[in-house]
């Protein structure tokens, strides 16, 4: 049985048979305002609680509100959340590579959201964008 990371949201965890599968790349899709970022923050909080010796890498491309983060994190140790804000798909790829080398104990990686970077990069150079996206996806695999 594949271990799962619960979100601590009963309805979501029921749909996901207990939470997201660990050791896999999961895509959360939905319209704007449907709670994708809230779910990502909840999963981050639960990963920090479940694995206190690890860190969570959170890639923020949307300008996450610190107020929203503190509401969800409550008394959870937010110092275990490594927040990065890359400026492009290339920067995201390079930053992820560096962080993965520097922090061998990462319990969860969240990219919220990758759409804008992929779209912009793709418009500039389709071949390079596709290659970078595939490389980035491969480095996220355990």
Question: Locations of the language-model features?
Answer:
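A conditional alpha-helix N-cap/helix-loop micro-motif detector
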Residues: 5-9, 37, 89, 130-133
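P-loop NTPase motor core
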Residues: 86, 96-142
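Acidic active-site catalytic centers that drive phospho-/nucleotidyl reactions
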Residues: 13, 60, 112
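Conserved P-loop
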Residues: 20-98
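Pre-Walker A adenine-sensing motif
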Residues: 7-19
